């Protein structure tokens, strides 16, 4: 089901630095889906593009249905593949002037891409591989959720998730006022993380390299478990409050 929420537009303009700007409208389309357990957000082109004022918001559905609110655009391809909602930013047909096509990597800036997903409690996996597209997860209550993020921030706010998995490439993870009994962070992909007014039971960390500058924040978790992927992997943790360190074999 697709409902028009208003008149929409896309505008292009050239900047002073010979780059081109694609501006998405804030007028939205509403699309309804059923049986969604996973969301995949990605870009299909390989051109040098960067995003500004762009994010994907995941919020709870009030009636058990999954809905997507997105700008109307020829560059957004939206579909459902089995239980996966697929959102593709496809800029391969972006029309450049003939002289610009001679450059190996034309510059393109995409502004104002705002996606909102109303998800039910069955959502279990979210992947966002568009660089610069921030991920916000607000008010979600579910048993488990796995996220894979490409070079961007994922922010969790006012959520209750029994088991949360975070990995990807160059991820910044921040949790605010959330309850997470089991938090799993893959440090090969999670660049840094912060916990703010949260209740976390066990924090599971894994990785294959040497990780410095990991400061255990006050009240961050009740227990931390380090599981290296390689024998020479090293985790450095700074503790600033009273605690107990227990070493044990597998």
Predicted regions and their residues:
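Intrinsically disordered, low-complexity terminal regions
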Residues: 1-149, 154-157, 167, 176, ...
């Amino acid at each position: 089901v697709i409902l028009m929420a208003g008149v929409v537009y896309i505008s292009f303009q050239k900047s002073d630095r010979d780059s081109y700007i694609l501006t998405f409208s804030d007028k939205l389309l509403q699309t309804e889906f059923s049986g969604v357990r996973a969301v995949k957000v990605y870009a299909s082109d390989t051109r040098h593009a960067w995003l500004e004022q762009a994010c994907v918001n995941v919020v709870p559905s009030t009636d058990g249905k999954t809905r997507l609110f997105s700008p109307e655009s020829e560059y957004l391809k939206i579909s459902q593949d089995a239980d996966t909602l697929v959102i593709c930013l496809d800029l391969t047909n972006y029309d450049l002037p003939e002289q610009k096509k001679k450059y190996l990597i034309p510059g393109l800036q995409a502004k104002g891409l705002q996606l909102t997903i109303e998800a039910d409690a069955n959502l279990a996996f979210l992947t966002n591989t568009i660089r610069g597209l921030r991920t916000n997860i607000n008010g979600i209550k579910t048993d488990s959720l796995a996220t894979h993020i490409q070079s961007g921030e994922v922010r969790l706010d006012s959520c209750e998730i029994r088991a949360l998995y975070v990995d990807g490439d160059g991820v910044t993870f921040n949790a605010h006022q959330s309850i997470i009994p089991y938090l799993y962070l893959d440090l090969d992909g999670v660049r840094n993380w912060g916990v703010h007014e949260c209740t976390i039971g066990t924090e599971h960390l894994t990785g294959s390299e040497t990780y410095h500058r990991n400061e255990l924040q006050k009240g961050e978790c009740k227990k931390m478990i380090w599981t290296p992927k390689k024998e020479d992997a090293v985790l450095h943790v700074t503790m600033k409050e009273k605690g107990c360190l227990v070493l044990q074999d597998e």
